[in-house]
């Protein structure tokens, strides 16, 4: 019965368009992100970026750049020549990224790197057709309507241009999310807005999004990383200070956030006592792709894209 009440509560919130905005949580996590998230998951991000070619002179767009972990790696691989347009909705995260970028671009006039506080969907819609060689989306496509965003990315990519997406999987932090669901099921009034995310089941699901958007998949894989937190208190600290729980503050009744955290911690303590360990996994997917090159027209005619016609 409690889960039915929770479902009814969620439906009412959805009908009223009560959606949690994760920006405040990312702002709060910005000073700790490179202490908690980047050392654990940053290596997976860098490995994913290595799966797409980047050459000096490339034009790169990075959506949701966060604290600039991948932005810095992109700049290094451009080797002194090229452009980067990186955006994030969180001013706090972008401030950290900007400091990294300034250190890497000083005295290198061949690099044109600009950072903007902006929404992913709005920014990509503002970009010209066929204006990017590579688009990178790290840990953030879940906050959009993925197929629609990917279709816009396809428009912005030049023919043959590449895309890399790394994203958290739907089964990540399973013990934690199950504990949170139980807390909300026991008292649905604690939930005041919905955290709207489209986390994929697996890499095949993201590959399906690519296909629907007209992009060719060049690689796909699933991965997992055990987070370095093995007590209930440490788990809760990691997910809050790493940004993994972004949206929590605005999703929970103001003034009862600590109550929710205490109840989740108790649920994790029960799991630890029952199982003997807390191995919380951050599962993720990596999918790379490309915009198909337009086939050559017969009899020597040029296609619209080859002729430069939008």
Task: Please state what every model-predicted region is.
Residues 2-56, 69-73, 93-96, 100-103:
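Conserved class I S-adenosyl-L-methionine
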Residues 134-147:
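A short SAM/SAH-binding and catalytic strip from SAM-dependent methyltransferases
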Residues 125-135:
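A short acidic, Gly/Pro-enriched loop at the edge of an enzyme's catalytic core
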Residues 49, 72-75, 150-154, 181:
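A structural alpha-helix within SAM-dependent methyltransferase catalytic domains
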Residues 59-125:
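Class I SAM-dependent methyltransferase SAM/SAH-binding core
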Residues 148, 154, 162-230, 246:
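Conserved catalytic/acceptor-binding region of the Class I
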Residues 2-18, 67-69, 198-310:
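Conserved Class I S-adenosyl-L-methionine
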Residues 80-81, 157-162:
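Short glycine-dipeptide loop
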